[in-house]
Amino acid sequence: MTLEILDIMKLLPHRYPFLLVDRIEDLEPGKRAVGIKNVTINEPFFQGHYPGHPIMPGVLIIEAMAQVGGAVAAITAGDKDDQVPYFTGINKARFRRPVGPGDVLQLQLELLSSRRGLFVFSGKAYVDGNLVAEAELKAVFAPRSQD
C-alpha cells in the first residue's frame, strides 16, 4: 500500500512546517512501512542549523520516523477518526551521519509489538543506502483536540 501526502494528512495531525513525511511506500498494516522525506534547502530549520553548513537536526529525523510509525499505527488500528497517534517514548537513538539539503531520507519502520493500544516500532533512516539514524519508538492513541 502506498500513501501520498493527502492520505498522510488524513491520518496525522501534523502540518507545515512540521509534517516531515512526503510519501509512504510498502505499507503493510500491522507490520512495516517505508517513508520518504525529500530534504530541501527550503526547510525552515536550515536557517539556524547551521548557517553555512546546513544539517537536519537529528531529533527531526527521529520525528520523521515517528510520523511514519504514527501512520502505520493509524492504519493498523483502523476506525480512529476521533483520535490521533501520540509519540510517547524513544529508546536506543543513534545518529550515524549528517543529513543535508538534497538528501532523500528513506525511513524504514517495523512494528515490533502492539498491546493495549501501545505501539512499539524499530526505526531506521537511510540516505543513499547508508544508515544515518536509528531508534526504538513508542506511540499511543489519544482523543483528537476539539479546538
UniProtKB/Swiss-Prot annotation:
Superkingdom per UniProt: Bacteria
Lipid biosynthesis is among the record's keywords: yes
InterPro entries referenced in this protein's UniProt entry, alphabetically: FabA_FabZ, FabZ, HotDog_dom_sf
EC number(s) reported in the record: 4.2.1.59
One GO term (biological process): fatty acid biosynthetic process
Active site per the UniProt annotation: H49
Keywords: Cytoplasm, Lipid A biosynthesis, Lipid biosynthesis, Lipid metabolism, Lyase
GO CC list: cytoplasm; membrane
Catalyzed chemical reaction(s): a (3R)-hydroxyacyl-[ACP] = a (2E)-enoyl-[ACP] + H2O
EC supergroup of this enzyme: lyase
Database matches in NCBIfam families: fabZ, PRK00006.1
Function: Involved in unsaturated fatty acids biosynthesis. Catalyzes the dehydration of short chain beta-hydroxyacyl-ACPs and long chain saturated and unsaturated beta-hydroxyacyl-ACPs.
Protein name in UniProt: 3-hydroxyacyl-[acyl-carrier-protein] dehydratase FabZ
